[in-house]
């Protein structure tokens, strides 16, 4: 367990805020698989202030998800402050997180996301204003720098703490790296030595063993798991159990994966129209199929589906095939 200000996080495993992924349906599933803290996908400050319908729907929080962190992004201090005030007063979020790590050009070109990393003074100013304006804890997720010549992680981390941030999460890659190359865990260790607030490590945590290694090597307070949890909430469960007991639980069976995939879809359909939910679920279902023999053919079929019944039928036939024990010729998949 650790605390972000007065918010108790029951374990040291955090679900990362992934854009286009971390809606209520995915977050609740992650919570049920053991994540101590789940983070909502980033929302635009200006979209909140303009009362954009899609954005306002993204602010929905199921009480079962809590504790939950809701992330906002923006490049202008005044609009960030006003959006944070709205989140503070009108949502069930426990924590307000500031995005300073998104490397996508459409975000950075408006001086938001990781663009803030280039100005440590602005980092201090915006966080101080947010902290002064809301009652909920304010946290920050940042990358270690823009490129190898512009790494201001120590200044930015110190300024975040000095401005009143209650915790900091660090993805230890530069913006230029995007998701390539190896994450530099030494950065997390160095920041942790300097700060008193909780430091959450992020980057290349792809197994329970690596989660423990990050905790041991960097002394960070928690690990943040992102892409490794896509279609694989068992990664969260197995990591929590491994950190608690030192034992690795079994990988899920194909049937278990498909059952949870369909549960995920049903939850999406509770917050979105069926066709929209099914189309969104196509990418998630592809992740659930990863590692299952014959899953490549299913992935292609998924892109033709429009209803829950169609997806359930496809998966049912696939499971019947898998569980029949039929051996197919190499490179030939029969469903």
Protein language model regions, located:
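Flavin-dependent oxidoreductase catalytic cores
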Residues: 1-335
